[in-house]
Amino acid sequence: MFSLQDLCRKHLFILPDVFGEHVLQRLGLYWRCHGSLQRVGDDHILIRRDLILSTNEALRMAGEEGNNEVVKLLLLWKGNLHYAIIGALQGDQYDLIHKYENQIGDFHLILPLIQDAKTFEKCHALERFCGVSCLLEHATKYNMLPILQTYQEELSMRAYLRETLFELACLWQRYDVLKWIEQTMHVYDLKIMFNIAISKRDLTMYSLGYILLFDRENTEATLLTQHLEKTAAKGLLYFVLETLKYGGNIDIVLTQAVKYNHRKLLDYFLRQLPRKHIEKLLLLAVQEKASKKTLNLLLSHLNYSVKRIKKLLRYVIEYESTLVIKILLKKRVNLIDAMLEKMVRYFSATKVRTIMDELLISPERVIKMAIQKMRTDIVIHTSYVWEDDLERLTRLKNMVYTIKYEHGKKMLIKVMHGIYKNLLYDEREKVMFHLAKLYVAQNAATQFRDICKDCYKLDVARFKPRFKQLMLDCLEIVTKKSCYSILEILEKHIISLFTMKVMTEEEKNLCLEILYK
């Protein structure tokens, strides 16, 4: 019979008026006690040509009556077999259920469609290998509180099952079940409820947790602290506000908001804070290397005016967190000089170099401050920004003339001479005569004496004329302020040049006269 008749029944949407009851019965399009059946669209039927029902509701009714012929017809019309089983359970039509048992497979799949507790329990009973625990888990999942109430005595004796159901109710967000379990039997620990509420961002469950906790007359300070830390770390403003209703320290919230860059949370509370408190938060933001937007938010509430400059600079340098300085520079609040002074005085050359690179401070500016504070290590380390040694010497040489303090000049010349001594001999020759004149001008006798020795190491053809010219140039540089040691060195080499017959006696006498006039 499958065949043409079934094919017709499946696709027949319009019944001809000439079809009488007998013809409809023969076609299987007649429902006893109800009337003719006609398909309407994909998911509805028409009974007696005037009553429209959903296909699944009709299946439930047919199942309740145990009318397998109508069930088969409605299944052809894309009905869901699960509704036929629900109806069969409501009408105790177990013969019909057994006919479709193999097609169902797992009766648990039907449970979400069932509205009443009695049918729910009867459906679960069809699963032969499931016990009470499984029934109660599914009752929790689908919010069948009456079933749980039926088994209240058993739950009160089985603590593990009770705790499990409570946790499942949290995961499935079944508030009525949560309330009933806690109020009738209590659970060992409500922390699981709060943890799940926070992870699911479920404010309703979170609030319910505090209601249940308050009913116990137990709001521990440690628990409030933990909740404030967790919710503020995640930026959950409304969870934070809910917690603060029951107590807790707002400083915890602000600390977490700064640490995790939750500006919405921070902005909500900043309006209520005094200036000193905001300045402390700014220091924390520097310490935690907060984002640009977080720093801008804090600074905007301070009108970009920071009173505790020294402390701010100490934090910037100590935690190598220079972003706040960049922001203030854009607002024309120049803290570079003040920061450099602190930085050079107290911190290592490596740390100074790192901050210099971050803030794009010129090396010359850092070196001058380091010379002022007599930090030779910083001068040397910073000068390595110029990779070429000859360039380093040239840059430092130019700086000598801009330094006012004699002790600073001497220190810089020592650094320069150290760089010179590390040059290859061929490279030394390129700068030795220029440096020698600088040393004479700056009364650097020790360095001048040493560089003159290097000049003697040149081959004779190059040495004699160039060294003679160096002595003549130095005579033009010497002044009344030149130290006695420089004069002695010049005298020695002038006499030496005369001995080597590079100078005439007349030239020698003239040079010595100029030297000591």
Swiss-Prot record:
One of the Pfam families matching this protein, by short name: DUF249
Matching InterPro entries: MGF_505
Protein induction: Expressed in the late phase of the viral replicative cycle.
Record keywords: Late protein
Annotated function: Plays a role in virus cell tropism, and may be required for efficient virus replication in macrophages.
Family note: Belongs to the asfivirus MGF 505 family.
Name of the molecule in the record: Protein MGF 505-2R
